[in-house]
Regions:
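Eukaryote-biased recognition of intrinsically disordered, low-complexity regulatory segments
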Residues: 1-23
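Ferredoxin-type iron-sulfur electron-transfer modules in oxidoreductases and energy-metabolism complexes
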Residues: 31-50, 97-248
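Glycine-rich phosphate/adenylate-binding loop and adjacent beta-alpha elements
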Residues: 70-94, 99
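Functionalized membrane-embedded alpha-helices
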Residues: 62, 68-70, 221
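Residues in well-ordered beta-strands of folded domains
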Residues: 6-8, 25, 85-87, 98-102
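Short, structured protein-protein interaction patches enriched in aromatics and acidic/basic residues
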Residues: 53-65
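Short, contiguous acidic and Ser/Thr-rich linear segments
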Residues: 20-32
Length: 248
C-alpha cells in the first residue's frame, strides 16, 4: 500500500507544533502500525530528517505505552486493541492517516507523539495498592473465600494498562475510568477493605490536583478503552467516594 501520513511534530512541551506530511510506499497489510512507523523512521533518517518520537515497549498490548490518536480515535479504528495490535490491513491503499499524540493538559507533550503520563503514576502512588507486608507471613490467599462474580469484576478492573486512551478520547480529559478501575480492583476484594476509605479519597484528590476534567457520562472512554473497562467502575468509585466522605 501507498499511504500519506500527516503526523504531529513538536520538539518539546514549550515548542509550537505542527502537522507534517510524509508519503510512505510499499506498506504491507500484515505490518503492525508501529512496524509501519519504524519503516517511516528509517526512511526519514535516510533523508536526514529527525525521526518521529513515539512511545512503545512490549508491542503485545500489555504495557500501554504505544498511545497514538489515529484519525481522530485513540489507538485507531479497531476496538479492544492498542496501537501496537492495530494492523495496516485496517487501512486502504491511498489512505491519508492523521497521527497525533494523546491530548490533555495533564499529558504534556515530551516530543512529537510521546507524552508525559506520569500523572497516572502519581495517582497510583496515592493509593492504588495494598500496603501490607506479605513477606511470607500472610495466610494463603485461597483460604479467603471470594465470590466468583466479585473476583471476575476485580480482575476485569485490574486489566487496565494505564494507556490514557480514556483521557484522550474524553471531551473533558477525564481520568475517571482509569482511577475507578484502580479503585474497583481493590474495593471488590477483602484485601482492599482495610485502606478503602483512604484509597478512594487520596486517589480522587490526586486526580483533581493533576488537572484532569470531570466525568459527564458520555461513555466515549469505555468505547475506546483497549481493555474494555466498564463504566460500572465509575459508578462503583462514586459510591466508594460518597461512603468514604460520610465515614470521614
Amino acid at each position: 500500500m501507498n499511504l500519506t501520513l500527516k503526523i504531529w511534530r513538536q520538539a518539546n512541551a514549550d515548542a509550537t507544533g505542527s502537522i507534517e506530511t510524509y508519503p510512505i510506499e510499499n506498506v504491507s497489510p500484515d505490518m503492525s502500525f508501529l512496524e509501519m512507523m519504524d519503516v517511516l523512521n528509517e526512511q526519514l533518517i535516510g533523508q536526514g530528517i529527525d525521526p518521529v518520537a513515539f512511545d512503545h515497549d512490549c508491542r503485545e498490548g500489555i504495557c500501554g505505552m504505544c498511545s497514538m490518536y489515529i484519525n481522530g480515535e485513540a489507538h485507531g479504528p479497531d476496538r479492544l486493541v492498542t496501537t501496537c495490535q492495530l494492523h495496516m490491513r485496517k487501512f486502504k491503499d491511498g489512505d491519508t492517516i492523521t497521527i497525533e499524540p494523546f491530548r490533555a493538559n495533564a499529558f504534556p507533550v515530551v516530543k512529537d507523539l510521546a507524552v508525559d503520563r506520569s500523572a497516572f503514576d502519581r495517582i497510583q502512588h496515592a493509593g492504588g495498592f495494598v500496603s501490607v507486608n506479605t513477606s511470607g507471613n500472610t495466610q494463603d490467599a485461597n483460604a479467603i473465600p471470594i465470590d466468583k462474580h466479585d473476583a471476575d469484576k476485580a480482575f476485569d478492573a485490574a486489566t487496565c494498562i494505564g494507556c490514557g486512551a480514556c483521557v484522550a478520547t474524553c471531551k473533558n480529559a477525564s481520568a475517571m475510568l482509569f482511577v475507578s478501575a484502580k479503585v474497583s480492583q481493590y474495593a471488590l476484594l477483602p484485601q482492599g477493605q482495610v485502606e478503602a476509605t483512604d484509597r478512594v479519597l487520596n486517589m480522587v484528590k490526586q486526580m483533581d490536583e493533576e488537572g484532569f476534567g470531570n466525568c459527564t457520562n458520555t461513555g466515549a472512554c469505555e468505547v475506546e478503552c483497549p481493555k474494555g473497562i466498564s463504566l460500572e467502575n465509575i459508578a462503583r468509585m462514586n459510591r466508594e467516594y460518597l461512603s468514604a466522605n460520610v465515614k470521614g
